[in-house]
Amino acid sequence: CAAKLSQMDRLGIDISVLSVVPLWLFHWTPAELAQDFCRQANDWLANFISGSDRLAGMATVPLQAPDAAAKELTRAVTDLGLRGVQIGTTVNGIPLDDERFKPFFDVAEESGSTVSIHPCYSGKPPPFQDYYMKNLTGNPLATAITASRLILSGFLDRHPRLKVILVHAGGFMPYQIGRLDHGFQVRQEASAHIQKKPSEYLRRFYFDTITHAPAPLTFLVDLVGQDRVILGTDIPFDMADTDFAHIIEQAQLPPSAITAIESGNAMELFNLG
């Protein structure tokens, strides 16, 4: 805990919302093993953040067993004081809009728990093994695919109050939303389950700032609004954005946007006030 707080001090971070690493999502293991692991991981995280009021946490759940995941989320939020949950983009290859996950998302929505979606691979890896593309290209692609499904399947209409974060600034999704809108207009498959253009669903999501460059961050804030973007770092990974302050400054955002992105939005989203 002391080392984490010291790191935050060096970076100028007042409060951090922590989650387990994606490798620990354990969506691909037998359900019983995942249930036991998630319970221990959440207990550990709750104990870790209890050492400081500058730390908060997000749970992990055995989503391959949706009823058990719903129960663990309830325990993590109610008993442990965690502020939400992190899940993968798929669960052992099954997309999140599949009806089998409804019990979990119902509880997340009813409890007001924020759901952060992070790329997670299981089974056969994506065909991006060269040049570190599994991360550089595969991660934002996985997020874009999942976000597309959540929009086009009608999932967001079925869960109108669910709070969802798309990490890595939404992957490729925000930058190709016009393509989905065009498909909605010309293809029956893309309009069968929704009544509005896909772009009208973008503000249902929250997006972190991890663009690694100011220009795409400027575009993102202009596209979705300053109230839908929160500061993200990806610490402690090699792809972490520890230069976030400079990037936000170079994005030439108005002072109100900077305040919202650096503090206000996350304070409200995670009930940190």
Go through each PLM region and give its residues.
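Mid-to-C-terminal alpha-helical segments outside catalytic/metal-binding sites
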Residues: 1-15, 43-50, 71-75, 162, ...
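Amphipathic, non-transmembrane alpha-helical scaffold segments
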Residues: 34, 38, 42, 144-148, ...
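Short acidic/His/Gly/Ser-rich catalytic and metal-binding motifs that mark active-site loops
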Residues: 25-27, 69, 123-130, 241
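Catalytic pocket-lining loop regions of alpha/beta-barrel enzymes
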Residues: 73-228
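Mid-domain alpha/beta scaffold segments of enzyme catalytic cores
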Residues: 1-91, 99-100
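Structural beta-sheet core signal
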Residues: 18, 57-59, 117, 166, ...
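Short glycine-enriched, charge-decorated loop/helix-capping segments at active-site entrances
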Residues: 31-35, 134, 246-248
